[in-house]
Amino acid sequence: MMGRRNDTNVADFILTGLSDSEEVQMALFMLFLLIYLITMLGNVGMLLIIRLDLQLHTPMYFFLTHLSFIDLSYSTVVTPKTLANLLTSNYISFTGCFAQMFCFVFLGTAECYLLSSMAYDRYAAICSPLHYTVIMPKRLCLALITGPYVIGFMDSFVNVVSMSRLHFCDSNIIHHFFCDTSPILALSCTDTDNTEMLIFIIAGSTLMVSLITISASYVSILSTILKINSTSGKQKAFSTCVSHLLGVTIFYGTMIFTYLKPRKSYSLGRDQVAPVFYTIVIPMLNPLIYSLRNREVKNALIRVMQRRQDSR
């Protein structure tokens, strides 16, 4: 199939991937497959441990189960198709491309607001520990979980509908390894200024609102920690937040680098590195970040294993 067409709209797209070299493609295939398997194992393991251990049935771990679910889904939307493209055909249908983009934007937006909900939960746990169960009732937890999914769906719907109205009559070659907004906008043969502005406003609002919420929560948390007299108390309070803060820093750092800039500044190569982190690497890192530094998760794993041995 040729990269140039005379149609009013293309039937499919060609994803160029990350490299033209067969040796590099095979190395990337093995690396991404390993990362994806670790992602599956880590996130499914986190879901099972929290589900099986009653002591982890708290708001904090309720949010963490949804983070694992989103990361698992997030990675599955992109990685399997990327692996297939590295080995076989790099074609993707018009419908398949926009479906992938819809799921990607939906899950990415939901994760942004979920991280905000988790920050508020940490604020309630550290700043008002005696009233934590009153501040975080089940109804509020459900609202803080439902909100990110609803907003994510609405943002993604508006995003994809606005882009689907564009015409792609010139080239069908996407210089990326998955269907992301910037490289697809670059293919349109119609004016994209209004669509770009809409997407920029949506992405900017999502990042800014969630970041402001997270920042406000952590300013209050830091203020409370500094008032704690004992060193051990400060360390314990800080340890409950450091995992979330590390995850937030990595996730938002790559997101801001990629999306809060105009499409004309999109750079082939440079702007393909950051998406590898937030679509493939971060979903693998989150279970490690939230479990390796978390004594409660480690103890829960030991209890689950002991119960399994005792039942034999």
Curated annotation (Swiss-Prot):
GO terms for cellular component: plasma membrane. The keyword Phosphoprotein does not apply. The chain crosses the membrane at residues 27-47, 56-76, 100-120, 140-160, 198-217, 238-258, 272-292. The keyword Transmembrane applies. Pfam families: 7tm_4. Its main location: membrane. It comes from the Eukaryota. One of its GO terms (biological process) is sensory perception of smell. SUPFAM superfamilies: Family A G protein-coupled receptor-like. Disulfide bonds join 97-189. Belongs to the G-protein coupled receptor 1 family. This is Olfactory receptor 8H3. It comes from Homo sapiens (Human). The gene is OR8H3.
